[in-house]
From Swiss-Prot:
GO molecular function annotation: ATP binding; serine-tRNA ligase activity
InterPro entries on file: aa-tRNA-synt_IIb, aa-tRNA-synth_II, aa-tRNA-synth_II/BPL/LPL, Ser-tRNA-ligase_type_1, Ser-tRNA-synth_1_N, SerRS_1_N_sf, SerRS_core, tRNA-bd_arm
EC number: 6.1.1.11
Protein encoded by which gene: serS
Protein's GO biological process: selenocysteine biosynthetic process; seryl-tRNA aminoacylation
Natural source organism: Rhodospirillum centenum (strain ATCC 51521 / SW)
Pathway: Aminoacyl-tRNA biosynthesis; selenocysteinyl-tRNA(Sec) biosynthesis; L-seryl-tRNA(Sec) from L-serine and tRNA(Sec): step 1/1
Binding-site residues for L-serine, renumbered to this chain: T228, A229, E230, E282, S382
Keyword Protein biosynthesis: yes
Protein name, entry field: Serine--tRNA ligase
């Protein structure tokens, strides 16, 4: 959500930010609604105040033997008028909130201009892709090993689901355990086991609602399956005032994530790249405003460290204005090398959302001994997507005989196992 005061103070800057997102100006419509809403609010409050004052005077008039009938008539008229004024105030407030809620976050000043992913800017590349003649894709390797079952998953769940078996299932578990240990022990994150079902308010707070409802799964009870643990971890600050001295919060969780993949027809239809259900380790930070830029770099380093320890080549790019997510003001994508595809593919996205989500959630902080509060900043990142890490390990560590070497960093989590073989 945007800061209405900032829009009032500098509407031109707000429209410039929207233009960088490829959107038309909106400040005029916002300020018109804001003015009408404030006028309606003033009328409503003035009528309430006059009704209360007139009601007080009625008692005094009667006590003094004065004619109170004009005041009685006035109070009756005000009582009839007030509900309409209250409804007008509510309606205009709802319209203003809806308009603000539909607009994305404004990009940070140092975000590169661009229309789409082709305009993203690479900032570093780590590791050299291995030369693997005839490299196979993960689904070819997994099916040949007898440890990846797409047909069985399709029979019970439909497209974009996978069954992992045996040592591939163990490898998935090992990857998640390794990531959680790294983030909690070396980067100071607190592990959380959050709900997978949330209410409307939670997905509104992080920005998935109202615009992206079609990307989510909703239950018959009205709950939403989380598309990412960003939703639950960030909402731990929902409607809260946090001691400023306790910040930053650093939280991590490994959860299943659920996405409808609306609009992805024909994309990555084979394998595990794009699934309706997948495992991910999420990183979330809640910070003071002055901490968030440094925290963004720190979070991105934590995600990169996962790939460095696994010996996986990757590159990090900063997303351009046309490719950023709805709630982000700046985003780094980390893309891992997949030999089977001969391409770098996203495995982590680390975003600084500034105060955008916090305003939607009413998440604030207060320094010790002070009365005033300030809106916090929120950040989130994949630390990393477990399924895509599994894919990357399979493709980068594949052997000519179809087996897969286990990266050294994972062997303690695999009981010392060094290689995954057929039906292992």
């Amino acid at each position: 959500m945007h800061d209405l005061r900032a829009i009032r103070d500098n509407p031109e800057a707000f429209d410039t930010g929207l233009a960088r997102r490829g959107l038309p100006p909106a400040s005029a419509a916002i300020l018109d609604l804001d003015q009408r809403r404030r006028a309606a609010q003033t009328s409503f409050q003035e009528c309430q105040a006059r009704r209360n004052e007139a009601s007080r005077l009625i008692g005094a008039y009667k006590k003094d033997g004065k004619d109170a009938q004009p005041l009685l008539d006035e109070v009756a008229a005000l009582k009839e008028r007030i509900p309409a004024l209250e409804e007008e105030d509510r309606r205009l407030g709802a319209e203003l909130d809806a308009l603000l809620a539909a607009l994305p976050n404004l990009p940070a000043a140092d975000v590169p201009e661009g229309k789409d992913e082709h305009d993203n800017v690479e900032i570093r590349r780590v590791g050299t892709p291995r030369d693997i003649p005839g490299a196979k894709q993960h689904f070819e390797l997994g099916e040949a090993l007898g440890l990846m079952d797409f047909e069985g998953a399709a029979r019970m769940s439909g497209a974009r689901f996978t069954v992992l078996k045996g040592q591939l299932a163990r490898l998935e578990r090992a990857l998640g355990d390794f990531m959680l240990d790294l983030h909690t022990r070396e980067f100071g994150y607190t592990e959380v086991s959050p709900p997978l079902l949330v209410r409307d308010e939670a997905v509104f707070g992080t920005g998935q609602l109202p615009k992206f409802a079609d990307d989510l799964f909703r239950t018959t009870t009205g709950h939403w399956l989380i598309p990412t643990a960003e939703v639950t971890l960030t909402n731990l600050a929902n409607d809260s005032i946090i001691d400023a001295e306790a910040l930053p919060w650093r939280l991590t969780a490994r959860t299943p994530c659920f996405r409808s993949e609306a609009g992805s027809a024909g994309k990555d239809t084979r394998g595990m790249i794009r699934q309706h259900q997948f495992m991910k380790v999420e990183l979330v930070s809640i910070t003071l405003p002055e901490q968030s830029e440094a925290e963004h770099e720190r979070m991105t380093k934590a995600a990169e460290t996962v790939l460095e320890r696994l010996g996986l080549p990757f590159r990090t790019v900063v997303l351009c204005t046309g490719d950023m997510g709805f709630s982000a003001r700046k985003t780094y994508d980390i893309e891992v090398w997949l030999p089977g595809q001969g391409a770098y593919r996203e495995i982590s996205s680390c975003s600084n959302c500034g105060d955008f989500q916090a305003r939607r959630m009413k998440a604030r902080s207060r320094p010790k001994g002070e009365k005033g509060t300030q809106v916090v900043h929120t950040l989130n990142g994949s630390g990393v997507a477990v399924g895509r890490a599994l894919i990357a390990v399979m493709e980068n560590y594949q052997q000519p005989d179809g087996s897969i070497l286990v990266p050294e960093a994972l062997r303690p989590y695999m009981g010392g196992q060094e290689r995954i073989t057929a039906h292992g």
